[in-house]
Amino acid sequence: MKTESIHYQADGLDMIGHLAWDETATGPRPGVLVFPEAFGLGEHAKSRAERIAKELGYVALGCDLHGGQALLTSLEQVMSALQPLRTEPAKVRARTVNALTALTARKEVDAGRIAAIGFCFGGTMSYELALTGADIKAAIGFHSGLAVTSPGDAGQIKGKVLTLLGADDPGIPPEQRAAFIKMLGDAGVDWQMTLYGGVVHSFTNPHADKVGRPEFARYDAKADARSWKQMVDLFGEVFG
């Protein structure tokens, strides 16, 4: 497996993505965008991109969120940075669409077989990309926020949507899940949502416990493994 930092522009920022692929493979293969948690492109999203490349043979791009591959260090910084991304569709969509363009420009990538995944706010970003009408086969969110900027655009979604949540995640209440399901259902989207019992936020991140708020964010090995398998199964379905 090989990795490389690639540069692309989005929303006036110099984005630095983390590309991973199997250099021994020949011919174009599926590509996967990996959108990170709200703190930015760190080891969690990078390691997931590398795992996709190593285990599945796809080309995976860990996507920058804040420019310069910056990592935020406090919840106050995160809330400030996310405010415009949650309220101005053009800002969040520039980050997703331009990352897609950077990935599909690679000769190793089959531009007709692309999916987007994301963790926490990164999962929201995968849905935002789908809402642009981008030609992606699937948008997958792990413990992802469901409050998208333009729910009225759900009819533009071309691929399948898979949402993987902790049933006890305090940040994603039942009413938010219901509204998201209604949005997708009304638009005729092929969607799935799985709830993991007794699981809260950030269940895929082994370092979630460092937050020190186990009632909110906590790693769960079983939910991590189950959600990864569901992602792999959907890739097999949509990529053929």
What does each model-identified segment do?
Residues 1-240:
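N-terminal cap/leader regions of alpha/beta-hydrolase-fold enzymes
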